[in-house]
Amino acid sequence: MSADFPSSTRPENRPPVKNPVQNPVLNPDRTPDQTPPAANPSNTATLLLAHGTPDRLSEMAEYLRNVTGGRPMPEHVITELQQRYTQIGLTDSMPGQGDDGLPLGPPLTRWTLLQARLLQQQLDRQDPAQTESAGQRVYVAMRNWRPSIAEVVAQMKADGVQHARVLCLAPQNSRTSTGLYRRALMAAVGSSFSVDFVSGWADEPLLAQAFAERIWPVWAEACAITGTRVPILFTAHAVPCRTIMTAVPSQPPAHPGTPVPADGMQDYGNLQTPDPYPVECKQTALAIAAALRPVGLTDADWFFAFQSQGIAGAPWIGPTVPDTLKALADSGHKGIVLQPVGFLCDHVEILYDIDIDFKQQAADLGLQLWRAESLNDSPTLIRAIQAALHHPATRLSADPESHPGQATEQPHSRPAHTRA
């Protein structure tokens, strides 16, 4: 393990970035009589789409209705999620702004806006003679919260945007992520402007490099501390089994906790039009592992699982993280390094599910758990986003097919693991 990846300085030790992303919708202090910044001369803009998260605990019920397409959630589910968000710092006070002009509230919002700002600054530094994306304006919209896709699209129309390159900040393509984002976007856009939509970027080399840069120092530290080859566990968010099946009455029952092979889809049902999500998640993990080979990682050193299976009664894809932790402990391992590869920044599925719940489960099994720092403000991630956005000829594809019962998300949380 003699090779090294450059390590980034943590955000709190960095000087604040002075110029926020120029999106009036994101600026609560902007009054209607203020003139918005001029649209890019090319009339082409970049739009980043994210999941969204509530700003305050009291907004949890409204947020969950957005996630489920209007279906109300039981009170005990709302309370459970409020408790989890409380443990990662969310309160009932409206978040203020930091010295850098970004909101101090939920980390998902703050990091997403910072990623957009860094992308904007990267585009502003580039020479228009060298790249067509130089100076393009960057917008951010949230599918399940504010600023909503409809709000931001309205602002883009007012700014004179005629063409948009759009990227979902969930690299792996799925009906319940990319498909829903695209449908919401096109419903808002209508015929107002043209859209190049990046349907998935799980195999972007710079994305794998960004993840590798984050996990390498943690893995090296864990191996040095334990004196053993500590296994790496890559994870991605689970989805309901029905998401990756076609909606036909003759489907056989699916079961959670069953591994999805790297080389294809498991037979979860009548796969006339299989959802690519499980395969793309594994592709990202394979690419990160390949990037780590120069520093000594072998195929025997890493594993893959799906995390944060939901509260819905229907089965979710696996294997689960708890099952994988137990299997590794039963095999004699004393530590594990975990890296979620479907998330680009800190949020509840990382700060609670991994840092609190999984860490305790690992400790109960005699495992020490390390987690790689999230990508957050990784410069390599920002380069990966631009690369994915501006190679549309190899990235665009048709919207994933929508099937009955698959057009809404499920809340991405489940009751805490029961411990003896």
Residue ranges of each PLM-predicted region?
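Active-site-proximal alpha-helix that buttresses catalytic centers in soluble enzyme cores
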Residues: 2-15, 29-420
